[in-house]
Structure formats: structure tokens, C-alpha cells
């Protein structure tokens, strides 16, 4: 049974890395879009490169599916976000 199948079988959430990218002139729209979206990601620190010119934001979230993970984001942000199933590893 795969790791994802085991997680689903025992009812645990999968871990996803959400990677959002936007243009420099879209920063205001991206951040403002959260004001109209009820999400546990609001008021929570995350990594972003807007202040250094990269205009990307990353979130690590737990969700039941990719769709559930993207639903944590406002539509405008989710449409510009890639999602990757991830897990922790021990680096030797």
C-alpha cells in the first residue's frame, strides 16, 4: 500500500506544498484577495519572495486532497498556484 493510500486508509491528511507566483504589479491583488476568503492561512506566517523581487509565495498545508488544499486559497491565488504532494525526509 502506498504512503498516500495508507494516509487515506487511516484518515490522516496528506501534506502539500503550494507554490504561488504572480507579477510584481499583482502583489496588492494577491494579498487583498485573502480579505474576502475565510482561510486558516490568513494571519499565519509563510515564506514569500515579494520583498526580494521574486514574487512567489509558498505554503505547506495538510489537506485531504489537492482540491481541498487549493480551496484554502482565494480563487485568484489558487488559479496561479502549483501543488506538490510532499513528505518529510531525514537527511543523513
Cite the ranges covered by each PLM segment.
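Conserved, structured core segments of small domains
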Residues: 3-92
